[in-house]
Swiss-Prot record:
Enzyme class: lyase
Alphabetical list of Gene3D superfamilies matching this protein: 3.40.50.1400
Keywords: Cytoplasm, Heme biosynthesis, Iron, Lyase, Metal-binding, Porphyrin biosynthesis
Residue ranges of the TM segments: none
Name of the protein in question: Ferrochelatase
CDD domains in the record: Ferrochelatase_C, Ferrochelatase_N
Length: 325
């Protein structure tokens, strides 16, 4: 059989219309009941921004990566079409024998990378060799891509203000239970205990790497955004609490830079551009956001390097053992 390689990009997914939001949310929470008021709020946000461009932008990122690599690039979504299972099935039908899967959530977490990984391997089985990129929060080209966007907003804003302008880095919050270290089960003492989830640490490491690439940055802070509207507690500090604290310290101008998202979608276009901006304005603060990475050449370069590295590892794992001398 002829060996054929490809790349698989994995993302969260978004519905195509407001009418599909209830079904989409059922996928997000694995079929658990969702309060009607939560469904209505999500629908409101979706409509307010004119629909989410996440799928279209992710497909564009795939096309750019395909041009850079000269290899087929597929895109699969966990919570909406094109579903990961359907895309992996198509890859097998297309004769793909090995692939590198890259989760477009750079910071590793059991709620992102772990779920995507299970979805890919559940369908691929033994039909295709998969190399999975576990997390790339500290990738130098990723940091350079964010820094490039940040610089383009922060420098002119600082010149306009005529004084210091701090930066607030953000990443999507996750449930507290996700990142808490599991405790040994006294009823099953031999059951292995998973290590703490790395997400909290990795999100802040990304921010640190981005900040280091922007010369003269006045100060920077970190918060978790877009906490869930139902369920138990989610990790913080929240953006709202952080904005309030910074206002009390006398800060009136701020750049907010999300570092966990690679393209525009609801959490940027609504949560940041509408909700957080209105919240800041009510405090008497001016908030600006850099452009999202979307079609950033540096992001394409980062993905290409990750993909090639993954392909090289797959190739090496297939290489025969050297003959004994």
């Amino acid at each position: 059989m002829e060996e054929r390689a490809a790349i698989l990009l994995l993302a969260h997914g978004t519905p195509d219309s407001a009418e599909e939001i209830p079904e989409y949310l059922r996928n997000v929470v694995s079929g658990r009941p969702m309060p009607a008021e939560v469904i209505e709020e999500v629908r409101h946000r979706f409509v307010e921004i004119g629909g989410s461009p996440l799928t279209a932008l992710t497909l564009q990122q795939g096309r750019l990566l395909q041009e850079a690599l000269g290899l087929p690039v597929y895109v699969g979504m966990r919570n909406w079409k094109p579903y990961i299972a359907d895309v992996v099935k198509q890859m097998v039908e297309d004769g793909i024998t090995r692939a590198v899967a890259i989760c477009l959530a750079p910071q590793n977490s059991r709620t992102s990378v772990g779920l995507y990984r299970r979805a890919v391997f559940a369908e691929a089985g033994q039909k295709m060799q998969i190399g999975f990129i576990e997390g790339w929060a500290e990738d130098d080209l990723l940091a350079a891509a964010f820094a490039d966007r940040l610089r383009a907003t922060w420098e002119p804003f600082r010149a306009e203000v005529g004084g210091p302008v701090p930066v607030l880095f953000t990443a999507h919050s996750v449930p507290c239970r996700t990142v808490q270290a599991p405790q040994p089960d006294p009823e099953a003492p031999r059951r292995p205990v998973l290590p703490p989830d790395p997400y909290n640490y990795e999100a802040k490491k990304t921010a640190m790497h981005v900040a280091a690439k922007v010369d003269g940055l006045d100060a920077w802070y970190f918060a978790f955004q877009s906490q869930g509207m139902s369920g138990g507690p989610w990790i913080g500090p929240t953006v709202e609490d952080t904005l309030t604290a910074l206002h009390q310290e006398g800060i009136r101008h701020l750049v907010i830079q999300p570092v966990g998202f690679l393209c525009d979608h609801v959490e940027i276009l609504y949560d940041i551009d509408i909700a957080f901006r209105d919240f800041a304005q009510n405090l008497g603060m001016m908030l600006r956001r850099p452009a999202s990475l979307n079609d950033s050449p540096l992001l394409t370069a980062a993905l290409a390097r990750l993909a090639q590295s993954g392909l090289d590892r797959l190739q090496a794992s297939e290489a025969p053992e050297p003959a004994a001398s």
